[in-house]
Design a protein with these regions (language model features):
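Short hydrophobic/Thr-rich beta-strand motif most characteristic of the beta2 strand and flanking loop
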Residues: 25-34, 40
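Conserved small/polar residues in nucleotide/adenosyl-binding loops
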Residues: 116-120
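Active-site beta3 strand of CheY-like receiver
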Residues: 44-50
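Two-component/phosphorelay signaling modules centered on CheY-like receiver
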Residues: 11-29
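The C-terminal output helix
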Residues: 102-113
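C-terminal output helix
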Residues: 92-101
């Protein structure tokens, strides 16, 4: 069973993603902020991290997918340059998210950066 960390500042988004992913057979953990996510990554070997654009990704070599409420080409390019495996806009198309998670877990590309942040 693949382990997914959901890092999002919105409690409703964390809960929605968690419910759906667990229904689909994933094991999930959810974190509201970078500190909680980093602590979880110390204890649990995640297969993928789903992250809101405003959150920094813990440097654990785990592939990540950015979930953004900002639908801009610049934001997407920045995310990919910073190592994101994919960039999806909110509201999330769950079928596309599931495809992205499976693709990332089945064939993860090397994560070339330490963390992702959208401080631009």
């Amino acid at each position: 069973m693949a382990k997914v960390l959901i890092l999002d500042q919105s409690k409703s988004m964390r809960n929605t993603l968690r419910e759906r992913l667990e229904y689909e057979g994933f094991s999930t953990e959810a974190a509201e902020d970078e500190e909680a996510a980093s602590n979880m990554c110390e204890k649990i070997p995640f297969d993928v991290i789903l992250s809101d654009t405003g959150c920094k990704i813990p440097d654990k070599g785990v592939p990540f997918i950015v979930l953004s409420s900002e639908a801009s080409i610049d934001s997407a390019v920045e995310a990919v340059r910073n190592g994101a495996q994919d960039y999806l806009t909110k509201p999330i198309d769950m079928n596309r998210l599931l495809q992205s998670i499976h693709r990332t877990i089945d064939d993860p590309a090397p994560v070339p950066c330490l963390l992702y942040t959208s401080d631009a």
